Amino acid sequence: MLQPKKTRFRKQFKGRIHGAAKGGFELNFGQFGLKAVEPERVTARQIEAARRAITREMKRQGRVWIRVFPDVPVSSKPTEVRMGSGKGAPDYWAARVHPGRIMFEVDGVAENIAKEALRLGAAKLPIRTRVVQRIAD
């Protein structure tokens, strides 16, 4: 699963996801992409599950690019623990995804296979997405 090799601090504030994506909203690598429509935190496990679903549907042909990286540590306290006594330990890693952000790109397969693969990958994610296609020049 994806996570940073080294971070400056173990824990971060929760933060909010305001506004549209400031970058990463165009297809840079593949012919087809999966674009986020709403803001949400996406965990490393969800990204990996979507990647596996896309790769499996493409039968390991073509190429898949992951355009989001989980760099936000999310902490949680154990169950049935009283409030207070500090912030919980880091539990998992997440990526803050803004609306308009391209999350996955695929290339090297037929259009119908690519769209079906991205649709199956989108089912593993907690946000509404849209399949986008590069406009032929």
From Swiss-Prot:
Coiled coil: none annotated. Keywords: Ribonucleoprotein, Ribosomal protein, RNA-binding, rRNA-binding, tRNA-binding. It holds the Pfam family Ribosomal_L16. Belongs to the universal ribosomal protein uL16 family. Binds 23S rRNA and is also seen to make contacts with the A and possibly P site tRNAs. Part of the 50S ribosomal subunit. This is Large ribosomal subunit protein uL16.
